[in-house]
Amino acid sequence: MEKYDLLIKNVLIPEKEGEWDIAVKDGKIEKIGKNIVGEAKYTINGKGKIAFPSFANMHTHISMTLLRGLGADLPLHDWLQKVIWPLEGEFVSPEFVKDGALLGIVESIRSGTTLFMDMYFFEEAVAEACEDVGIRAGLGFGILDFPTKVAKTPEEYIQRARKFAEEFKNRELVFPVICPHAPYTCSPNTLRMAKELADEYGLLLHIHVAETKEEVERIKEQYGKTPVEHLESIGFLDKNVLCAHMVWTTEKEREILKERDVKIAHCPESNLKLASGIAPVPDYVKRGITVTLGTDGAASNDNLNMLEETSTCAKFHKGYNLDAKAIDAGTALKIATENGFKVAGIKAGKVEEGYEADLILVDTDFPEFQPLYDPISQFVYSANSECIDTVICKGKVLMEKRELKTVDQEEIFAKARKWREKILSKLSSL
């Protein structure tokens, strides 16, 4: 008799007729079939549930959950300079980062995410939180030209990034990423050093690019080129580059992105809230540029809900482009799942044999799914995260029946409330 680590019985799978069993072994989907017979360490009754791939949040600053709700209704640069950076200068520490990361991880799991791509400070603390809970993450120190608590010079940032890459390069769930912040906060030399480090270790480069008109004008004034043209001119762009936002790009820049096989992390809700603009995602997709989805930080979104982000991605581009087919439900879901895992180098994002068992089970016993005609469109357009019953990462059950299995939610909430008191005290003096 076959032995499995996990057996999901009688579950629905989009675009397959009837009920199916999913057998998981060593973190992978070993078999999908009818009435699978085998001995399983753990069995889940999937009756009335739909199996989808879990979400990959490809751009966030997860510890900023502790700054959520501050500086509302400000544009990006005012929000950063008047609220976020002063508070980070005061409070960011390994303890702040881990507590914020745990809060963000709880929110992420509850909304179906098993992989996130993070750029922040003290990423060792985020790695510890991820490994404690059992969630995947690509992690990188923000590399800057100006001093912060973690480094004083670009060379020091690079040194910290190198040390982190060396320490975490062979972990099971977390992996290092090189994260120069943006072309307007990193000199050409800093960007080149970051690229050299990423290439040396075979890592992704994760960077903010062309988020606002103001940024584009600043780069043009400083370098005489648009952001993408500037990055191309210094030899930065390559297939291992993940650019967050990419809201303001020209025809020429899009040709460069396609030619260099640059990847994009689209963050529609953050771009809307900060009034940054609307990324030309349908055009990117049409050109064959790989687009992934991200929430950005919880302080600028203001949540980490990837189902909500997926729905916004699909709906907003329809309205903005006056085209109901601009981004359909299936494309939005692929952008939010399969594309992200692929960019991260993880064979997940599909409910298929041989793929990593990063899955969610969505309960159809909700009005949003009654009657059930089209699981994908009803998940993207109708459902909310309360419909997500079970979350599985690399074959490990992180949530079942909406109950978190690997983390104490109430303990994390209590820590968040303590940070609130400290932050409110500081705000009164700003």
Swiss-Prot record:
Q: Where is substrate bound in this sequence? A: 88, 181, 211, 296
Describe cofactor binding as the record notes it. Answer: Binds 1 zinc ion per subunit.
Name of the molecule in the record? 5-methylthioadenosine/S-adenosylhomocysteine deaminase
User: Is DNA damage among the key words of this record?
Assistant: no
GO terms assigned for molecular function = 5'-methylthioadenosine deaminase activity; metal ion binding; S-adenosylhomocysteine deaminase activity
The coenzyme or cofactor needed here is: Zn(2+)
Q: State the EC number(s).
A: 3.5.4.28, 3.5.4.31
Q: Which family does it belong to?
A: Belongs to the metallo-dependent hydrolases superfamily. MTA/SAH deaminase family.
